[in-house]
């Protein structure tokens, strides 16, 4: 019984830590959105935010993230999508990134879709 209780507590702490990390990332993303209303001006802010929360995973994620931000910005600059659509696309990409099992492959596929 004690082992089950201990495992339950550890599991809850782990889930809480993951949820807290996601919440902090989303809060920082919203701060970037408030400071830089235009997605195209928020590239450095979003990049630093991503790097802060995913740096322990892989430097390759950071490079791919930068390519994705630039691709979304290019679509906005060329009037293929609006600023609001750019923010929504970014939010969906990050949400799906968090839930994907093969994160590198997911980011690579996103890059190809955005081109």
Give the residues covered by each predicted segment:
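Bacterial Sec signal peptide processing site at the extreme N-terminus
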Residues: 17-33
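Extracellular/mature segments of secreted proteins
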Residues: 25-27, 35-58, 62
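Intrinsically disordered, glycine/charged-rich N-terminal periplasmic/extracytoplasmic linker segments
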Residues: 51-115
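A detector of low-complexity, intrinsically disordered, Ser/Thr/Gly/Pro/Ala-rich segments
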Residues: 18-20, 38, 80
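Amphipathic alpha-helical repeat scaffolds
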Residues: 33-34, 73
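Classical Sec-dependent N-terminal signal peptides that target proteins to the secretory pathway
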Residues: 1-22
């Amino acid at each position: 019984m004690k082992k089950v209780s201990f495992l339950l507590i550890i599991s809850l702490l782990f889930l809480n830590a993951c949820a807290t990390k996601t919440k902090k990332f989303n809060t920082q993303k919203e701060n970037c959105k408030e400071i830089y209303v235009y997605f195209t001006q928020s590239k450095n802010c979003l990049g630093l935010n991503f790097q802060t929360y995913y740096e322990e995973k892989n430097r390759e994620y950071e490079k791919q993230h930068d390519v994705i931000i630039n691709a979304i910005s290019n679509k906005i600059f060329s009037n293929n999508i609006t600023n609001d659509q750019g923010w929504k696309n970014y939010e969906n990409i990050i949400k799906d990134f968090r839930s994907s099992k093969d994160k590198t492959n997911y980011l690579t596929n996103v890059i190809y879709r955005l081109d």
